[in-house]
Design a protein with these regions (language model features):
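Catalytic-core regions of glycoside hydrolase
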Residues: 6-9, 60-63, 72-234
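C-terminal functional modules
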Residues: 228-398
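Substrate-binding cleft of carbohydrate-active enzyme catalytic domains
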Residues: 1-101
């Protein structure tokens, strides 16, 4: 038998029983899910093994079950076989027991990104043949996406029932170096039970730190029409860390964005600027914010009574405090730079405020402030070095800057295009569309003799490369001239 069909060891079975009892005490429905996986045969032995496992779980106290057919290939993706299995389980197990909730299924086509939209697609087959009581998961237009009437209309018209929305937030399995503490938004507030039968939030691996987002999702589901993301977030901060709320808020407001994929707003109360656009009032306000950032970790450590939450946040808080320090120093350094009276003093302080390789490795492992704070530091240091070297030498230094139509091309991720390290790379985090572009700003008009683009992986299944692309150049950033014909599937 596959391992998934075997009984749990005694200790694990006891843990599940304990968890189920805790759920009952707290009015939470415990749902046990199984993923049949690649080894499914669709034969009678398979079916009886599954029923036996369901009965074992029933005896442990499980009264709600789900089957997942996501992220597999081969025979297991057959929607006709899936519906036959689900319908038979509903008849033989769910209805015969009498006290078991309706089944839930995650289809192979759980996102519009790759779902077959035709009447022959698996979703349409679900709609025509799947027992009406069975609830069907849906992640939206892409894997991580907002809950909108449009995406529900699209899927509901095919599965012929209100979808069960699987919201991939605040999960960070695609950005494990980030911990999401921002407001819960992107959930439409005009929906009702005719549009969806439920919503499930996929949390981070950090259980305690996920509670801020789960507090928002719970609030949304309790009263959809009245839900307000910011009001909920402000209340959640106080609920989770009442004795250090303001310091926690400082950390949370700068720990919202993913940098890639499912982008979230961050640092919306903070205004940053380039050194060339210096404004003393804005500089003082930004220094005060960096000062709060620098002090927040110690204040949180002092006031946080949830040891589990503190343990999860600590690696990020350590780097957050360092970000506050280097941000303050960058602003202080900018005053010396703008004064222009002591080159030696400026350069000594500049060198001391550079991030070492170890500093960067530590920050990359536990990032925050990615949308505004760290980019301010990076841009300020780059701008001052560029201006200083130009003034000293009288020549324009070589300076490459990543640009593009993708939103995160404006973040420090774009620097990874030109760091001379083949183990690091820039990724947009989203699929390319017609008209998307990525490029390099050379800083000034220069002769270019070679363009080298390293992309893709050593895999036949890889799709991370430009497709139907053209290499172009521009002198003014407005008029573009092709350098090549269209390039198709060239990994290079």
């Amino acid at each position: 038998k596959p391992l998934s069909m075997l009984p749990y060891p005694e200790k694990e079975a006891g843990n599940i029983k304990e968890l189920i009892e805790a759920c009952k005490r707290n009015r939470v429905d415990f749902v046990w899910a199984i993923h049949p996986g690649q080894d499914i045969k669709w034969n009678e032995e398979d079916y009886q093994n599954l029923v036996n496992k369901f009965n074992l779980m029933y005896d442990l106290g499980v009264r709600a079950f789900a089957l997942f057919f996501d992220d597999i290939s081969g025979e297991g993706t057959n929607p006709v076989k899936q519906t036959e299995l689900l319908n038979r389980l509903t008849k033989d197990f769910v209805k015969s027991k009498g006290d078991v909730a309706y089944l839930t299924v995650c289809p192979t086509d759980y996102s519009k990104l790759w779902a077959n939209p035709t009447p022959q697609g698996s979703l349409a087959i679900y709609g025509e043949t799947l027992d009406p009581s069975i609830e069907v998961f849906w992640t939206g237009d892409v894997v991580c996406s907002d809950l909108t009437p449009e995406t529900l209309d699209w899927v509901n018209s095919r599965i012929k029932r209100p979808a069960y929305f699987w919201w991939n937030y605040p999960v960070t399995d695609y950005v494990r170096n980030i911990i999401l503490q921002g407001p819960v938004y992107g959930l439409n507030t005009s929906l009702d039970s005719n549009d969806l039968c439920g919503i499930a939030s996929n949390p981070m691996e950090h259980g305690e730190a996920s509670k801020l987002a789960l507090y928002g999702v719970a609030d949304y589901t309790w009263n959809i029409a009245a839900y307000n993301p910011i009001d909920n977030w402000e209340r959640g901060l106080g609920e989770l860390m009442p004795k250090a709320r303001e310091a926690y808020r400082t950390f949370a407001i700068h720990s919202c964005d993913t940098e890639t994929g499912y982008r979230r707003d961050e640092s919306w109360e903070t205004k940053t600027f380039r050194i060339g656009d210096w404004n003393e009032t804005e500089a003082q306000a930004l220094w005060a914010e960096f000062d709060k950032v620098e002090k927040a970790p110690a204040e949180i450590e002092k006031g946080c009574t949830n040891k589990g939450l503190m343990s999860e946040l600590t690696p990020w808080l350590q780097e957050f405090g360092k970000l506050g320090t280097r941000g303050k120093r960058a602003l202080e350094l900018a005053r010396v730079y703008r004064d222009g009276k002591d080159d030696a003093d400026f350069w000594n302080k500049y060198i001391r405020n550079l991030m070492s390789k170890k500093d960067r490795e530590d920050y990359e492992a536990h990032k925050s402030g990615t949308m505004k704070l760290q980019p301010f530091y990076e841009n300020a240091m780059d701008d001052m070095a560029y201006g200083f070297l130009t003034r000293l030498s009288g020549e324009t230094p070589i300076c490459y800057r990543g640009i593009g139509s993708f939103h995160n091309a404006k973040t420090t991720l774009s620097k990874l295009m030109f760091d001379h390290d083949t183990t690091t790379y820039y990724t947009s985090g989203i699929a390319q569309k017609a008209g998307d572009w990525i490029g390099v700003d050379l800083g000034s008009v220069k002769d270019v003799t070679e363009v080298s683009i390293l992309q893709g992986r050593n895999s036949v299944d890889d799709v991370d490369y430009f497709d139907h692309a053209v290499v172009e150049y521009s002198i003014d950033g407005k008029a573009w001239t092709p350098l090549t014909e269209e390039l198709n599937k060239q990994i290079g």
